UniProtKB/Swiss-Prot annotation:
Chain intervals with Low complexity compositional bias: 65-80, 107-121
PROSITE patterns recorded: RIBOSOMAL_L31 (PS01143)
Comment on bound cofactor: Binds 1 zinc ion per subunit.
Name used for this protein in its record: Large ribosomal subunit protein bL31
Biological role: Binds the 23S rRNA.
Region described as Disordered: 65-121
Binding positions for Zn(2+) per the UniProt entry: 16, 18, 36, 39
Subunit: Part of the 50S ribosomal subunit.
Cofactor entry: Zn(2+)
InterPro entries associated with the record: Ribosomal_bL28/bL31-like_sf, Ribosomal_bL31, Ribosomal_bL31_A, Ribosomal_bL31_sf
Start-end of Basic and acidic residues biased regions: 81-93
Organism: Anaeromyxobacter dehalogenans (strain 2CP-C)
GO molecular function terms listed in the Swiss-Prot or TrEMBL record: metal ion binding; rRNA binding; structural constituent of ribosome
Length: 121
């Protein structure tokens, strides 16, 4: 391995809120966690009441100071675009009707006429 490019991998202590200390190795250094295997309900089989009320209060106090969102600007009436859409639909329908009539008139004689390459059996 090259020297000087790898991070320092040192002994680390992970401190839990319950008081448990886990010794491991990391590049981070010492750090604190809220729940570990000693106090997590899955491992202990005991139910733990989380401090959700405190979290809600912190959220409310944090966002109470922010101003309310401004009302959205009023939009112009959408009557004209609706008329344009209707006109475009009518134009497409008229074009399809014309195209359908011309295709039918071309297709009918071709179906009645025998093919030049067809061999009688």
């Amino acid at each position: 391995m090259k020297e000087g490019i790898h991070p320092d991998y040192k002994a680390t202590k992970v401190l839990c809120a319950c008081g448990n200390v886990i010794e491991t190795r990391s590049v981070r250094g010492d750090f604190h966690i809220e729940i570990c295997s000693n106090c997590h309900p899955f491992f202990t089989g005991k139910q733990k009441i989380m401090d959700t009320a405190g979290r809600i209060e912190r959220f409310k106090t944090r966002y109470a100071a922010t101003p309310a969102k401004a009302e959205p600007a009023k939009k112009a009436p959408a009557a004209e675009p609706a008329k344009k859409v209707e006109a475009a639909k009518e134009n497409r329908a008229a074009k399809r009707a014309k195209a359908g009539k011309s295709k039918k008139s071309e297709a009918a004689p071709a179906a009645e006429a025998p093919a030049a390459d067809a061999k009688p059996e």
